[in-house]
Amino acid sequence: YYKIFFCSSEMYYNSFNRVSQAYSGPIEHAVDDILRKKEYLNSTKFLTYEPTKTNTKLVIPNTKPLNAISFLASQSISQRYKNAGYLFYETANGFNFRSVESLLAVNGVAPRPTKFDYKYQIQTVAQNNENKSPSLSGIKPKDVFQDLKGVLRYEFDRPVNMLKNINEGLFANKMITHDSFYKKVTTHDFDYLSSFGDYFHTETQGADKADFKGLVPLHDYEDTQKDFGEQANAKLMVYCDNQKIHNNFEFPPLKDTIQNRRSQRLQMMNINLNLEVYGYTLLHAGDVISFDLPLMRPIINEGDKQQSSPYFSGRYLIMAIKHEIDVNGNKHTMSLKCMKDAVKTEYTPGVIPFKPDTKSYNKAFTSVYSDDLNYLTDNFENA
């Protein structure tokens, strides 16, 4: 048999075309121009965009169209939300150019409703006898909609890596900018914990964004009297922030793009969930779903209900969908790659202060030559 791989016509145009052009004004207009022009991507597909407040002039030098759009996305600042950096992706409905926060909220005032609700549950008799006719097997016909909500398999493929999160600047980072025009050096610190409530997250409830449901609890690290968000030296970045390059056009402020975007992208790489579910073609990348994950512990008392995981249940954002169609088995399933950037229930804040036992610390240091001399002395005395 043959294995055939497909791609869009835009991918072919991207392979042999390049963009060498300067764009000024709103960035979404530049994206639409690259998408439509025949000498670039020559696309006729629908484009859904989120308006930007970025009014700048950007020069794209001999760059492939999709790479040019990725660059423009990195420079975009939302008109309604505080986050920085846009996503450019395609679904069955066309292309999308928008921020992550616009996927999680509606008009900047409320969390976006879930498109579908999944639950990990025991398969029904109808599911286990799906190849049998209901009239012959003596079972009731399937409740199709209820079966669609069931999860065939799930796994978390990216467990939280605290050291990577710290070193890459998720929780805190420091950026030093140098402006050659004004001859000015400025330092900016980013604090994930203190700025958490400024943005919509997967677990934001209502219009109130103040509830802290971050990836780490609010607690000082050991005896430093600082939490993870105050350790800005964990990630140091240096950038040129020159002004007056294109007359009255100004670049997006780096303090509003680089640091925030770095943290947000790292948040998307932490709680990553893979779901195998029944096929449902109304779901697309960028939709919000809910997943009820049972708490993995035994039910002791009769009549008690299975509790949901307080941290990993809840709302997820779909990052990618893979449809799998088995023609011979008459079966359609989907693999959903999802993420969440907040826990359902806030981690318990640390209330017991750390008190190091200084008496047990061994602060002395010893020369290896002294150890060798003691070893030789002991051996000669015992000889």
Can you say where each PLM-predicted feature lies in the sequence?
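Acidic, low-complexity/disordered segments
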Residues: 209-240, 285, 290-383
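Oligomerization/assembly interface segments of phage tail-like spikes and tubes
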Residues: 1-10, 265-277, 314-320, 332-342
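Solvent-exposed coil/turn segments that connect beta secondary-structure elements
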Residues: 7-11, 93, 100-103, 278-280, ...
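Short beta-strand-centered interaction patches in the first periplasmic/extracellular domains
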Residues: 4, 47-158, 162-171, 181, ...
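Intrinsically disordered, low-complexity terminal/linker regions enriched in Pro/Ser/Gly
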Residues: 30-44, 48-51, 129-175, 346-383
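Charged, gly/pro-rich, cysteine-poor intrinsically disordered low-complexity regions
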Residues: 119-285
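Surface-exposed cap/loop segments at beta↔alpha junctions
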Residues: 1-46, 57-58, 73, 101, ...
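Extended serine/threonine-enriched, polar tracts that run as long, contiguous segments within proteins
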Residues: 68, 76-77, 94, 102, ...
